């Protein structure tokens, strides 16, 4: 426990929380344009070809965003909406593309967990 004299000399420091998605700049989502769409392989125990896109945001930042779901129509110059959220087995991928908005269509034939993949309720 510090003395009052010590606190006067050196005030208590505020603990600042560090954001995990800094390029969004405090916004829940950001719009961006795909500059490259490609696949990468995950970290060690896992094996796959994960679909990712390099996106230039309206704020000027260039980020790598994951394309969730099976099948996608994203290509170069597609306008997409990006949200925060990392992919644990892809180093450097800290963002997700939001399906079902702008140029990213929803996942075809999706029945469960539809809201996460931008799919309307089937009739």
From Swiss-Prot:
The keyword rRNA-binding applies. It comes from the Eukaryota. Transmembrane segments: none annotated. Its main location: plastid. One of its GO terms (biological process) is translation. It is found in: Plastid, Chloroplast. InterPro entries: NA-bd_OB-fold (IPR012340), Ribosomal_uS12 (IPR006032), Ribosomal_uS12_bac (IPR005679). GO terms for cellular component: chloroplast; small ribosomal subunit. GO terms for molecular function: rRNA binding; structural constituent of ribosome. Pfam families: Ribosom_S12_S23. Keywords: Chloroplast, Plastid, Ribonucleoprotein, Ribosomal protein, RNA-binding, rRNA-binding. Belongs to the universal ribosomal protein uS12 family. Part of the 30S ribosomal subunit. With S4 and S5 plays an important role in translational accuracy. Located at the interface of the 30S and 50S subunits. This is Small ribosomal subunit protein uS12cz/uS12cy. It comes from Gossypium barbadense (Sea Island cotton). The lineage of its organism: Eukaryota, Viridiplantae, Streptophyta, Embryophyta, Tracheophyta.
């Amino acid at each position: 426990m510090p003395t009052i004299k010590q606190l006067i000399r050196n005030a208590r420091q505020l603990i600042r929380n560090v954001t995990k998605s800094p390029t969004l700049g405090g916004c829940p989502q950001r719009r961006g344009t795909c500059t490259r769409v490609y696949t990468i392989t995950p970290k060690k125990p896992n094996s796959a070809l994960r679909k990712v896109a390099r996106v230039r945001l309206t704020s000027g930042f260039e980020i790598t965003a994951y394309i969730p779901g099976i099948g996608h129509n994203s290509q170069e110059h597609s306008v997409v909406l990006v949200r925060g959220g990392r992919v644990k087995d892809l180093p450097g991928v800290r963002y997700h593309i939001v399906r079902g908005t702008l140029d990213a269509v929803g996942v075809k034939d999706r029945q469960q967990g539809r809201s996460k993949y931008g799919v309307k309720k089937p009739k």
